[in-house]
Amino acid sequence: MSIVTAVVDAHVHLHACYRPDELLSRARQNLAQARPSSDLPTLRVFYLLLAECQNDDSFGDLRALALGGRARSGLKLQTWMVRTTDEDRCVVVADGSAHIYVVAGRQVACREGLEVLVLGTTQRFEDGRPIRDVLEETEALGVPRVIPWGPGKWFFRRGRLLDSLLEEFRKPTLFLGDEGGRPEFWSYPAHFARGARLGVRDLPGTDPLPFSHDVAKVGRMGFCVPVELDPLRPAASLLRSLVNPNVPFERFASLEPPLRFVRNQIGMQLRKRRRDSHQASA
């Protein structure tokens, strides 16, 4: 095993509107632009941590391809290749000398309007449950659980709830998560400083939205962390560092331009209205 710097995007979706090869190439390009300090090891490896919604299983598709089968969704790779590791929760994708570890994880939409990312697991969780129940259930897994930022999600009632959750569930496996969708004019939310005082750290990632143009930002927000890498068990190697409060993180970020932020928010509202209209007519 060797000590390396892991360059990580901790909130990734492989949406159906994306071309998988483009996502991986963009991620490789963006992660390679991160500039760790001289205190971190020179050798770098790249990670994408998936946070898949209830009905999605892109990781399962990638693993099926790695095992020589077909993806249920029809997902295909053209220039990138995928192979298994010794872990059911991690595959490695490669294009020539470039490779990225892709780690399974889930995104749980909770009843209160907050979300929990459960990283490094293939276990499924139902949406719509109270967030306290989700945090209690996932605590036993010993993997990172992240409450991600979202526009307006940490204000008022939900902001007060978040304050309570930070007090109740503060452990090395609980994190907050900054997102690449935060616009340049939106300052770093105060809850991150509050969490840091309680030992709840920021585990940032891009959280690309389900629009084809958003694939370009995968890998633009994340962090660098020293890892004792076992190439056969790369997920366990990374997660061991993440839940160790004595291991430092160095975040990097490219925030959303204001016009792109407004465009995406309008697009998400229109998407939600179409979905609600379809459900009402069904």
What are these regions (language model features)?
Residues 128-129:
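Caspase-like (clan CD) cysteine peptidase catalytic core
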Residues 51, 148, 205-206:
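Generic beta-sheet signal
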Residues 1-97, 101, 108-110, 132-133, ...:
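An N-terminally biased module of ancient metal coordination in phosphate/nucleic-acid-related enzymes
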Residues 100-104, 160-162:
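Short, functional N-terminal and low-complexity linear motifs
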Residues 1-10, 14-21, 110-123, 136-141, ...:
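Charged catalytic cores and adjacent phosphate/nucleic-acid-binding surfaces used
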Residues 45, 142-144:
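Loop/turn elements at helix/coil->beta-strand transitions in domains of secreted/extracellular proteins
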Residues 105, 150:
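Active-site-proximal beta-strand/loop segments in catalytic clefts of secreted hydrolases
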